[in-house]
Design a protein with these regions (language model features):
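N-terminal alpha-helical membrane-insertion module
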Residues: 1-84
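N-terminal topogenic membrane-targeting module
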Residues: 48-56, 61-148
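Amphipathic alpha-helical scaffolding segments comprising HEAT/armadillo-like alpha-solenoid repeats
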Residues: 111-113, 130-147, 166-177, 197-208, ...
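Conserved hydrophobic register position within alpha-solenoid helical repeats
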Residues: 129, 157, 188, 217-218, ...
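Core register positions within helices of long alpha-helical scaffolds
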Residues: 132, 160, 191-194, 220-224, ...
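Short inter-helical turns and helix N-cap capping residues of alpha-solenoid HEAT/ARM repeat scaffolds
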Residues: 149-150, 180-182, 211-214, 240-242, ...
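Extracytoplasmic/periplasmic C-terminal soluble domains
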Residues: 182-288
């Protein structure tokens, strides 16, 4: 993912700039001395020629390095690609042909081929690849524990561990969730979500609660956990702050964690509008009617914030009772196009005949037009 040699290139650029500064300094001294008759013309000419020679040498070295670097990396990438394809073929034949793979240690392209197979395959074949990765004793956990490893090298190691999905490597990942570098923290969170299983989910949840990641990153981690997300979501709901609570509520709806639907209901009375909206979205995605919370839904339907009214109108339709029908009828008079749309779709879901009445007799012309439009689309 990252080209190697950037440190040598940075050092070479620094040397070029340093030599140019020396050359310019020598020119300033020589010509200033000549200006005040302190030096003769030969000294000034010698300084000028030395500066020109030094500049030419520095630029030649820099240009040669850039050309050689690109030529070398292009040929190396081609060799690595061929080696990767060769190892991929050998491992595939061993996997489906029932033969043992070549004995380790394996080079870097071989490990990359194993990671690709681990990502593509499921079930028994994937577990066999995991065993081969364990036999290879890959360097990625050791890289993470090395104090002087570069940032790109650590990111590569975290990405490789995420692809390998070996539960025993979680302990090497968790310390990076408290790393001062936010990029490494995010990479560690993604890797931990791919790796954690069983008791490791509890340790991952505790580390995430202390990681200080933004809500979008936390939600991404929960979605990566997929069917393993419930313990982490429960930890967020119990001990999380605003960011963790929002991510947990979003994940409950997107992952269809129906057993946690009861935990969402109290957030309908949340003062924070973002958390309340997340709770409304979660219940709607779960198709979980909030029985006993009708008053809070009606209050949200009258809120000054449009996004809350939209979510409340959608969720009211799940109640399927007369109270919800009357509330959605009134919502057809809302000044917001999106609220009227949500109300009309909710009435269509509950009682198409009632929506047909709204299309004919609703007092608000915009409400009638919306009801007619939704009926035409449903026809």
């Amino acid at each position: 993912m990252w080209r190697r040699g950037e440190r040598l290139y940075a050092l070479l650029v620094f040397l070029v700039v340093f030599l140019e500064a020396l050359a310019l300094g020598g020119l300033v001294v020589a010509f200033s001395g000549r200006l005040f008759n302190l030096f003769g013309y030969p000294v000034a000419y010698r300084a000028l020629f030395q500066a020109l020679a030094l500049t030419g040498l520095a630029l030649s070295c820099l240009s040669a390095y850039i050309l050689l670097y690109h030529a070398y990396t292009a040929s190396k990438e081609l060799r690595d690609r061929r080696a990767y394809e060769d190892w991929l073929t050998r491992f595939t034949q061993a996997l489906f042909g029932g033969e043992p793979p070549p004995p380790p240690p394996w080079p870097r392209p071989a490990l990359e081929a194993l990671l690709s197979l681990r990502e593509m395959l499921k079930g028994e074949f994937s577990e066999r690849i995991a065993e081969w990765l364990r036999q290879a004793n890959p360097p990625w956990p050791r890289i993470l524990k090395t104090r002087f490893a570069s940032r790109p090298l650590r990111l590569e190691a975290l990405e490789a561990l995420a692809q390998a999905r070996l539960p025993e490597t979680l302990e090497a990942i968790l310390p990076y969730l408290s790393h001062p570098d936010s990029v490494l923290r995010l990479a560690a969170a993604r890797a931990g979500a791919r790796v954690a299983q069983g008791e490791g989910l509890g340790r991952l949840a505790e580390a995430l609660l202390q990681a200080g990641l933004p809500r979008g990153a936390l939600l991404e981690v929960l979605l990566l956990l997929e069917e393993r997300a419930a313990p982490v979501v429960e930890a967020f709901l119990s001990r999380g702050g605003r960011e963790e609570l929002w991510a947990a509520l979003e994940a409950i709806g997107r992952l269809k964690l129906v057993p946690l639907g009861e935990r969402v209901l109290p957030f309908l009375d949340q003062a924070d509008p973002e958390l309340k909206a997340a709770a409304l979205r979660a219940l709607y995605r779960l198709r979980y009617p909030p029985q006993g919370y009708e008053g809070l839904l009606l209050a949200a339907l009258k809120d000054e914030r449009e996004f809350l009214r939209v979510h409340a109108a959608r969720l009211l339709a799940l109640l399927g009772n007369e109270l919800a029908q009357r509330a959605l009828w009134k919502a057809l008079s809302d000044p917001s196009f999106y609220v009227r749309r949500a109300a009309a779709e909710g009435l269509l879901q509950m009682n198409k005949g009632f929506l047909a009445q709204a299309a004919e007799r609703h007092p608000d012309p915009f409400g009638r037009a919306m009801a007619q439009q939704v009926l035409r689309e449903a026809a």
